[in-house]
Amino acid sequence: MNAAVNKSPQPLTDTFGRVHDSLRISVTDRCNIRCFYCMPEEGVHFMDRAEILTFEEIERFVRAAVPLGISKIRLTGGEPLLRRDLPRLIEKLAAIPGIRDMALTTNAVLLEKQAADLYSAGLRRLNIHLDTLDRN
């Protein structure tokens, strides 16, 4: 029998020897605001929806990453709250054995409407970016 088959997966390590335990997943390239440094009004080309990973593909990828030491997931975008049925994805990912932290980076524009469902699905941490304190 091939010895490589019985070998446990090695943790994800960068060229400096640092072990990585977190995975950032962009669930959409769409955004509902236009920050000049990220989504300028012109020149942004969005991916076809068929090119964006399905929830099943994302779940399969995370399941494959857990044996490599991944235990933390951060969902980003674009604006991840624009992704339809996001709580369903969070629920699937939070239920994967070995995942101990689920986080979301958001501009929070849509958060009020979705917060309860996100929490119920297993989201426990938010990173809210404020790109200005000026309403205009």
Protein language model regions, located:
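Short intrinsically disordered, low-complexity coil segments enriched in acidic
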Residues: M1-N2, D134
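Conserved alpha-helical substructure of the radical SAM core
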Residues: N2-M102
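Conserved radical SAM core fold
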Residues: V27, V44, P80-L82, R100, ...
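Zn2+-dependent cytidine deaminase-like catalytic core
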Residues: A116
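Acidic (Asp/Glu)-rich catalytic clusters
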Residues: Y119-A121
